[in-house]
């Protein structure tokens, strides 16, 4: 395998696992389930909460920075950035980012309306009421504040929450001419500046809509691509260090969650940096040693899983919880793991059926070229 193929396949190998990690994080973020006005508090399940802290320490916040880095690297890879190139790439991103973003948020709005109008709404502790408004409709595509259901939510995410990454990526892509111009003149200083803003932004309690993380990692990837940096060489130098740091910081984050919770934010940011190097180095190592290879189907399904899982995972979790009624940490953990497997399985099946019987529809909703 050539170095170019190894670099490309190392990125492709990461796509599906990263999507599953995002799904897992979103499912395990649900630490209490309300049914018929009664909320189950999972603090009563100590082993389950320890597993949750482990997932927080090792996986939360890791996937999207890697996605951003890959996006920045690929955007500028192997092309001369002329006016015609930008126009072509912008047109492509309309198909691969903007159209799916609009469609999947519309799906979320429709699902919200169906949920509010369904008979099950009356079993909620505080039944929602559909209150249509232009402001509420538009907020669903940027930062949804609950207007469509007559409530107030302080949030930085669109209605289909995982799509914040796509929203931010659209904005970053629009800035790529300026990013290219600045990188050509400032080189890595722009990367360092954006890295500092990302690293220290929590100290200032400013709502960034997560644009800090998107810009930093996209620009970092763009810098390496524009300057023809070989990731196999640059990241490979830190293989052992990244493994040690990633594991050590994950453990430290779990311990800090118990004893020094104020430090978890800084620890997590350092671990995100180590995690990026670790993930790419591990992917390249697995391929180079023939331990695994890229599954084209899973890699191509990763974006579909990412944009769609938020619409069904929470509902599947609630159904599974109500059906099983777990009475211990182990049984609760079994419920959560089962929901991850069921959700991934259903979405892969849906992707397969769409690819086989409605490929044109899949191209539109999944941003496939």
Language model region names:
Residues 52-65, 153-168, 201-219, 253-278:
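Interfacial loop-to-helix transition and helix-capping segments at the boundaries
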Residues 219, 226-297, 301-304, 311-336:
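Alpha-helical transmembrane segments and terminal signal-anchor/GPI-anchor hydrophobic tails
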